Amino acid sequence: ECFFNRGSAKRLVVFFSGARTRNGGRDLAPFPTFSSWSWGSETNASVLCIDDPMFYNYPALPLGWFNGTEKEDYREYVASLVCEISRLLGVQTRDITLYGRSGGGTAAIAVCGFISESSAVAINPQLDIAKYPYNEKFTPITGINKSDEAFLKRNNFENIIKQHKKNTFLIISNAASKIDYDIDINFLSAKFGANLKYGLSCLDNLCLWQYYACGEPDPHSAFDNPALFRMIMAVLELIKAKNIDGAALLASFANEYWADRYELLMRKREINQKAVSRGGEIKALKDQISEKEKVISEKNKEISALKKRMHESLFAKIRRALRKLFNK
């Protein structure tokens, strides 16, 4: 399924959905999920959001990468859909940007390979899929063998990038994310001989952008927000215009904002956790005080009863003494 918002410019941005997992991977969100569907106001381009069709065939699947079945390549179908929509809009393929995060970024790169001169922006994508933890669920649910020739060809991202020189691939990775660093950043370094550095570096049609953000709730999920999206799109346009120095400068400013934003989110969470903890402590103290007040109330009742008995006993003794006195 898709969500579409028409813009005023002859440009098209396509957002791809990623994993359906929520609450630390414990739950699956219902589908369809349209990533960044409300961001049409952040750009004058038309915006197309596409949910992963894998979820319709495999409802228990947490992440499908738009892979398809053993015989059908869903990414090729999606590329045909994007090209038809761009034709109707009068958008040239060089003005198509395929955009995704995590598994959506993986799909963006793959679909880009089917659309000549298009661009892909992928934030923390999975590039060496065979090493990714979700593989434990992918094969049992889909029945797709990851050693199958079609699967390997579809997910050979080295070839996709190297064989499509007219396309622009901007891969953005969080150096603070262990899983992205250990698997995908090392993959890029090994396959492309990239001398990775903090900030932006370009190798032919591939540009690598390293940022560092602590992450909320985790570094892998330290994705962009509307402000960063606008900066990323501006960096992409500078890259396409061969103004790499300008792109690198803007990326460095974006990195500062990116790091500060998630640092503030982390502090906010810590403050909230402390507030919750303090709230719990205060509640516990209030409960203790309430229990003490109950005990004191019971003691006061006992004291009142004892005083009453003492008074009654004293009056009785006085009455007996008076009777004896008057009887004499």
Residue ranges and their predicted role:
Residues E1-A45, C49, P53-N57:
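Short, surface-exposed "cap/lid" segments of acyl-processing enzymes
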Residues L48-D73:
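Cap/lid segment of the alpha/beta-hydrolase catalytic domain
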Residues W65-L88:
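Alpha/beta-hydrolase active-site loop
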Residues V91-S102:
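Alpha/beta-hydrolase fold nucleophile elbow
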Residues G100-A110:
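Glycine-rich nucleophile elbow surrounding the catalytic serine of serine-hydrolase chemistry
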Residues A122-K131:
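Active-site nucleophile loop of the alpha/beta-hydrolase fold
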Residues A130-Y211, G215-M231, L236-A241, D245:
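The feature captures the conserved acid-bearing segment of alpha/beta-hydrolase catalytic domains
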Residues Y262-K328:
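Boundary detector for helix-to-coil junctions that initiate low-complexity/charged tails
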